[in-house]
Structures are given as structure tokens and as C-alpha cells.
Amino acid sequence: MRFNIDEWEPKTTIGRMVKEGQITDIDYILDNNLPILEPEIVDALLPDLEEKVLDVKLVQRMHKSGRRARFRATVVVGNRNGYVGVGKGKAKEVGPAIRKAIAQAKKNIIRVKRGCGSWECGCGTPHSIPYKGYGKCGSTAIEILPAPKGVGLVAGDVAKAVLGLAGIKDVWTKTFGETRTTYNFAMATFEALKSLNFTRTMEKHKEKLGIVEGRVL
């Protein structure tokens, strides 16, 4: 369903500022570490966001009244141009579980640092990543490494979905531990992308590596 900002009634200060046009760029929120507590904030500022359901599982737990079953969904959202988020949601039915996961993924949105860090390439365009990143979730870990143009996403399906929606076209990956848990694998990949933002780069190297944070116009 297409988002209509006129029908949105924001519940937070940031939400009201977005609706009133005082905040018009998602980067302002991310640069100032402002909390995104409403998924509609992302809907308003990143209207080209795509959603992909990675996994829906039936999970059961014992309760004093008997066995209770719920659905757990894992979702990734991204605009294929420098922004991505991962989330999970639980509910008694599939639809609400997916909607909860989408909402959480939007609230977890990050800006992705891209570039060309492969010594085999050196084209200076943001088709890959500028240097290696590492992420871990539970017993799952992943290392992402710069790759030359044309290699593609050398990764498992879950990591490929996260990297693709982030706007990365070429990358090598190494995985460690248990990769069969979809949510952990997706979150480990998400954390690896997030880790790229913690490395500072000198200005003279930024141009050489073609580093871009967020969208490429």
C-alpha cells in the first residue's frame, strides 16, 4: 500500500518535524543520531524503498496453557542506493509478522559506505566497498571484502539480498559459524555494512577509493 503523508498522524517530535517539512533528508536524522521511532519517517524520506521477505518460520514455545505457535518473519528493506535495514517480527499470523518485521527494518535503517577498494580494480566508482567489514550476530559471522567490477555478489542468498538492497554490486564474502539461521545471517551482514562507517578515511584516500556515503545522485 502506497504511503500517504497526509493520512499520517506522527506520534514523535521527529515525526512531526518530517511531516511539517522541517526535516527533508534522512541524512539529517542519521548524522545527528536521532531516534527513528516511527517507520513512516523512513517512508516519507525514502519513498523508493524496496522490501524483501527473507524468511517466515513457525516457532513454538511451551506455556502453562499448552503449546503456543507464532510466526517469525525476517525482512530486509533498502533503496539499492546506499540505505538498508533489517528487522524481524512475530505474530500469530503471517501478515502481521511480516508487517512488524518491515516496520522494525525501517526503524533500523543505516547509511552504507560504498567505494572501490579492490587492488584489482581501482576504477574509483562506488560499485563495491572501500575496505573490509566484519559483522557478527549470535553464532554467525561474516567478513565482506572489496571486489573488482564485474565479479558480482559472491555470497549466500541471504547476504546477497542485504548487500543488493544496500546498493553494492561487487563483493567477496567469508562466513564463519552457523549460517542456516536466516535472521542471524542477515543481521551479521547488516552489522558488517555498519562496521564500514566506523573506519575514518583521510580525504586524499576518499577520492582514490571513490568513497560515497548514502545515495549516489
From Swiss-Prot:
Gene Ontology biological process terms, A to Z: translation
Domain comment quoted from the record: The N-terminal domain interacts with the head of the 30S subunit; the C-terminal domain interacts with the body and contacts protein S4. The interaction surface between S4 and S5 is involved in control of translational fidelity.
Gene name per UniProt: rps5
Matching InterPro entries: Ribosomal_Su5_D2-typ_SF (IPR020568), Ribosomal_uS5 (IPR000851), Ribosomal_uS5_arc (IPR047866), Ribosomal_uS5_C (IPR005324), Ribosomal_uS5_euk/arc (IPR005711), Ribosomal_uS5_N (IPR013810), Ribosomal_uS5_N_CS (IPR018192), Ribsml_uS5_D2-typ_fold_subgr (IPR014721)
GO CC annotation terms, alphabetical: cytosolic small ribosomal subunit
UniProt keyword annotation of Ribosomal protein present: yes
Pfam families: Ribosomal_S5, Ribosomal_S5_C
Name of this protein: Small ribosomal subunit protein uS5
Subunit and partners: Part of the 30S ribosomal subunit. Contacts protein S4.
Domain S5 DRBM span(s) in chain numbering: 49-112
GO molecular function: rRNA binding; structural constituent of ribosome
Species, as recorded: Methanocaldococcus jannaschii (strain ATCC 43067 / DSM 2661 / JAL-1 / JCM 10045 / NBRC 100440) (Methanococcus jannaschii)
Keywords annotated in UniProt: Ribonucleoprotein, Ribosomal protein, RNA-binding, rRNA-binding
Family in the record: Belongs to the universal ribosomal protein uS5 family.
Function: With S4 and S12 plays an important role in translational accuracy.
